Amino acid sequence: MSSMTDDKLESNYKGNALLHLLSYMKPYAGWVTLCLVLVLALTGFDLYRPTLIGDAIDNFETQGDYNVIINTAWKYGIVLVVSFIFNMAQTWILQKTGQKIILTVRRELYIHIQSLSSRFFDLTPVGKLVTRVTNDVEALNEMYSGILVRLFRNIVKIIGLAVVMIALDRGLALVSFVLLPIVMVLTVVFRIISRKTYRIVRTKLTDINTFLSENISGMRVIQIFGREERKFEEFKDKDYRLYRAHYREMMVFAIFRPLIYILSVLSLMIVLGIGSNEVLDGAISIGTLYIFSQYIQQFFDPIQELAEQFSTLQSSIASAEKIFTILAEEPQVKEDENPIVLPKVLGRIEFDHVWFAYDGEHYVLRDVSFVIEPGEKVAFVGATGAGKSSILNLIGRYYDIQKGHIYIDGVDIRKLSKKLLRSAIGQMQQDVFIFEGDIESNIRLHDDIQFEDVRAAAEYVNASHFIEKLPQKYKEPVTERGATFSAGERQLLSFARTLAHKPAILVMDEATANIDTETEILIQEALEKLMKGRTTIMVAHRLSTIQHADCIMVMHKGKIRERGTHQELLAQNGIYKKLYELQIHHVISS
């Protein structure tokens, strides 16, 4: 089963990422408008300051009055103070608005990921999803917190400077713009190269996050097989590739910025050279030349910033495309428009000529039909890959079938509310997932379950035997995946979690497979009581654990080949008997 690549993810998104990003700003349109007004004012102040000093130079030259300098200083100071206040207000608005939008995007993405079907998670590495929710969402922060507004400010500033310079002296303005075509070419080249380098950085970062997520989770296996050095070499290779990608990105900026600076200095030198002659000829004043010199410096700065900001904007759009691709991903298992909500689930299960393939092509279940009445205990046995666990996945509708029907209490599960269906099924797996928190929260799973019910469930499955011995009992902290508990203790917590939610149907995928003999003895009695009055479906490899089932179904290559009680199947002298004799022989040999 191949994983879903970044290219595949991006190809699924067909919308306009920038327009989609801008749509998140609609709820804050008032604040954004105020921010743009402040930007226009700040741009006006930037244009006014050189004019203020230039006029002061000309007035002092003609009048020789020091009051001109004093008045100019006061005006300049007031402009600086007002600019500071406006800039502070603009920054506060941008940061607050940007963080709220990022909060919205991150929550929307997480909620959507929760709604996706199991098939999506089968194909998508966890590390990539973590990167989307963290790094890629954070990449949008700079865009919302400044890039868009600074882009607007720099564009307005460039236009304003060009208009004012032409108004002051058209000839000198044209001289100032002589190097502009070269700057524009460099800017376009920079944008193209920087976008490519950024995409490479993001890809390498995703690769290393995926590697870390997988290998840290599987560190025990790495240590058991002594693969630390090999894995470190793989990590070094991926880390070096990320370093090289960052280095190339840095070099692009390191070359572009000095080039723009050199061109701005050359332009200034040309203007000062020509402008000085015009001053000597009396064509323009010294103040006008000063204004031009300041405007040229201001003119090239926003051009450089525009190129870098466009690059950052493109980077944000690249991250947004990945995010919106996930948001555009449709759950394969969809809720019915008018789902049926049963007042009470009795637990009757029927498979009617069911065909199922995880990839839609290679069937793992072929024409499977059976009926389980409420309260019956049914076990599925067979070799690995026979389709036993697939049946469990289909009962909870984690996947949809290609052909046939599955009914719960006579209702097609595709018509039932997914929440109601899954809440009626208590699924106990071999690989128990324990969340960080405490024991009580892991049993309750933050549902509306009273502590008395939590404790009663733990006592019922004998989990209280080890919980009561802990220093903080039910408030005992639990580390990630419950690493401080034994496999048997984690299974007991899983049993208690299932019981606390009072399901009508029990599904056990070799639920006692990883439990030691002593712990298994403790829970067998609890399981017998637990299964009374509940439809129970068991998948077992150890046939000794299911001999008392009401019905045993033997699966082989996706089909039910035999069915009956333990004794009936032995009498058939078929697949089940062979499996049973093999296990008996193995036990005797051991």
Regions found by a protein language model. Give the residues of each.
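ABC-type nucleotide-binding domain
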Residues: 335-336, 342-590
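Helix-loop-helix
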Residues: 62-65, 71, 164-178, 248-321, ...
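An intracellular "coupling" helix at the cytosolic face of ABC transporter transmembrane type-1 domains
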Residues: 118-119, 135-144, 148, 156, ...
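Transmembrane helices of ABC transporter permease
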Residues: 27, 31-44, 79, 146-200, ...
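Short intracellular "coupling" helices and adjacent cytoplasmic loop segments at the cytosolic face
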Residues: 2-9, 62, 99, 107-131, ...
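Membrane-integrated ABC transporters
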Residues: 1-48, 61-74, 90-94, 98, ...
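Hydrophobic alpha-helical membrane-associated segments
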Residues: 41-45, 49, 77, 81-93, ...
